């Protein structure tokens, strides 16, 4: 489902021939260099940030169950980290090299996992919004519903559904060879009606409907909080509002980050996507926005969650403490016990 930066055949799938004389516009130059620098920054920030989130959430007391929200955040971070490690370095070669050199398997895998990661992210965010809805609107029943077992089952279902939905991308992604010894990795569907149907279904079920579900859940949450504001303790009110705010910001950022990607796909399938400097810039921006979504969530947690900030600091303190053989045992025990995040207590 990912549009290649050098050709549009992946976008419309109608013709495996590249645009005539694309090098003056799409050749390696200042634009591609800047894009590679942006990719490098996204990769470095995302790998560091998501690794930190995973470390924080993995450091729980033995035998203590993790909260459902934290399990979903952990799943989101794992999906983002895997995407950054497996996709961005390979996709960057498209901007750096004039031809595809990584073979058929990598051609299929990176575009397939790109779509899998996108779907896992939006489905996880939808699950988190439902989790917030149950925790706040149906708080009396939430203790029996919001358990680790149900969250893990949900995570398993999310991955299975995403893997299945993305499978056509892997099937139709293939290599095309030109007489000039150039190779391109393109998505090509023999039946264009099937391609159009798949693009629409991916947009509807992998973007639009999950966002509508998220909007519904948060509308209910905000309405409930407004009605029950007087009956809540200030501490409980602040905790629930902060958790809902954090998840909501993550959702809004996801929606903004992935909207240009879907616009380009729908435009390429049902319109005449132009090959102009402006459209090339739009495509580059869509790529960078989609990729950056995998690196911004840890920053959001740091800005909106005081407990996440404390946990981040404790990860580094723990490393310093482990390197000091004469550290105080009591202080080390305190550091080794991670604080809960705002998402833990609801």
UniProtKB/Swiss-Prot annotation:
UniProt membrane topology term: Multi-pass membrane protein
Gene, per the UniProt record: Galr1
PROSITE patterns linked: G_PROTEIN_RECEP_F1_1, G_PROTEIN_RECEP_F1_2
PTM characteristics: Three cysteine residues are found in the C-terminus, at least one of which may be palmitoylated.
CDD domains named among the record's database cross-references: 7tmA_Gal1_R
Annotated function: Receptor for the hormone galanin. The activity of this receptor is mediated by G proteins that inhibit adenylate cyclase activity.
Residue ranges, annotated region (Disordered): 326-346
Stretches assigned to coiled coil: none
Protein name: Galanin receptor type 1
Side Extracellular, residues: 1-33, 91-108, 172-196, 268-269
Stated family: Belongs to the G-protein coupled receptor 1 family.
Places the protein is found: Cell membrane
GO cellular component: plasma membrane
Keywords associated with the record: Cell membrane, Disulfide bond, G-protein coupled receptor, Glycoprotein, Lipoprotein, Membrane, Palmitate, Receptor, Transducer, Transmembrane, Transmembrane helix
Glycosylation site positions: 7, 12, 181
Cytoplasmic side of membrane: 55-69, 131-150, 218-246, 291-346
Oligomeric and partner information: Interacts with GRP39 AND HTR1A.
Disulfide bond positions: 107-185
Tissue-level expression: Spinal cord, small intestine, Rin14B insulinoma cells and several brain regions, particularly ventral hippocampus, amygdala, supraoptic nucleus, hypothalamus, thalamus, lateral parabrachial nucleus and locus coeruleus.
InterPro entries reported in the protein's UniProt record: GAL1_rcpt, Galanin_rcpt, GPCR_Rhodpsn, GPCR_Rhodpsn_7TM
Transmembrane intervals: 34-54, 70-90, 109-130, 151-171, 197-217, 247-267, 270-290
Any single biological process term in GO: G protein-coupled receptor signaling pathway
Pfam families linked: 7tm_1
